[in-house]
Amino acid sequence: MNNFPYHRICVVGVTGSGKSTLASDLARRLQLPFVELDALYWGPDWTACSDEELRQRADEVIRGDAWVVDGNYSSIRDLTWPRAEAVVWLDYPLPLILWRLWKRTWKRVLTKENLWGTNTEILWPQFFSKDSLFLWALKTYWKRKRTYTDLLSRPEYASLRVYHFKSPRETEAWLRQGIL
């Protein structure tokens, strides 16, 4: 039985926090469309679309009355958040984020998992390049904490129901409450 009152939900957090996993699970449980912003952003061979193109793609999907959006693209936050009813913020400790990123990267490299079409992760760049997801997580972790704390306290987002989880245990307890 679905007693969850919100039908437009944004799941946010740093890379490796579990946004896609949780958003996909929420969408399945609530029987809502799942929108993975990375899938809108990345083209073949890791070609990024322009901000304008991302905005057009995102605008098309969030026009609907119900969705679960996964992602942190600040260039479209002005589209997604005003339409959202709830934000789920996965604000987990940095060591856990890095551990999850490590496991996810190895799994994707070893299985050659396709991401957003034909893209696959390659070991060396993920660990040792300036485009490393690990480096990105380290660079953005504290900035994201400050950004979300600030954004979620702004009057224009006062109508959002915020679920702020600081550990996977908190998130799992919320999911077990039976509202979903």
Positions of PLM-derived features:
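Conserved lysine of the Walker
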Residues: 19
